[in-house]
């Protein structure tokens, strides 16, 4: 397609186990996506749509959580790692296992190893992005990822926003900003 495409979906998702006591095994999940526009405006539009949908659904307070998969890409850029080594690093990041990350990154340049080991601590409010700029090695890809997150956060000031720079859910699918919105108790 040469045009922008907007998609939405809604339906029940069956879980083998409930997330918590007295919770349903078949929660309602809905989502929306925009294809065909690579700019931040599309990310902003879809986040605003998701936020508005949660507010209309009267789910209570809304929290936005964001990351950018290019942060890990920027750290690993230029490194020759096997698929197994990359998978092990991703697993350790997802578990926020700094001890395992330290072992896995021993052979990498210090700036890369230190950056990867810093990611599990880089979560919280927008100040995390300033901390990331101080402790992660600068590169065009890294700088762009952090600036994009800041740009979005500035335009979404009316919603509680958190960042988890080690969050790799959907890493293989996403190419930039990844976000999740939570209503009520999240």
Regions found by a protein language model. Give the residues of each.
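Positively charged, Gly/Ser-enriched RNA/tRNA-binding surfaces
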Residues: 1-60, 102-186
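Short, conserved phosphate-binding/catalytic loop or strand-edge motifs used
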Residues: 26-30, 66-74
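Hydrophobic mid-domain F-helix/FG-region of cytochrome P450s
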Residues: 49-56, 70-80
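A generic structural motif
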Residues: 64-66, 90-92, 164
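Short, solvent-exposed helix-helix connector turns and helix-capping sites enriched
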Residues: 68, 96-97, 125
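Short glycine/threonine-rich loop-to-helix capping motif typified by GTGT followed
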Residues: 73-83, 173-179
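Acidic, His- and aromatic-enriched active-site or binding-groove loops in soluble protein domains
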Residues: 80-104
